[in-house]
Amino acid sequence: MPPNLELLRKHFAEQSYLLTAHASSRAIERNIRSKEIEEAISTGEVIEDYPDDKYGPSCLIMGKTTSQRMLHIQTSYPPNVKIITVYEPSSNEWEADWKTRKHE
């Protein structure tokens, strides 16, 4: 079942989430601040759902920061919200809408 996006947004607005070690290292490598993640979630939309992910049910959210930086954020479902990874989508892997994966 896809997550309730409003509930996810509430967790992020209240800073009631964790970053996995992987997400934390990726955010540092990619110079993505927590505030930017929160901004992107607040305006974002779920573009992929992973109900059977090996780390537990999660989804991929696409959103923009206030500076218009596009981010993809994979996050687990509530009640224990964790960011699994975060990145700027690449035009090599994503269509121009940033929602659709390119197929090889």
Segments and roles (model prediction):
Residues 1-104:
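Ribonuclease/tRNase effector modules and their secretory precursors
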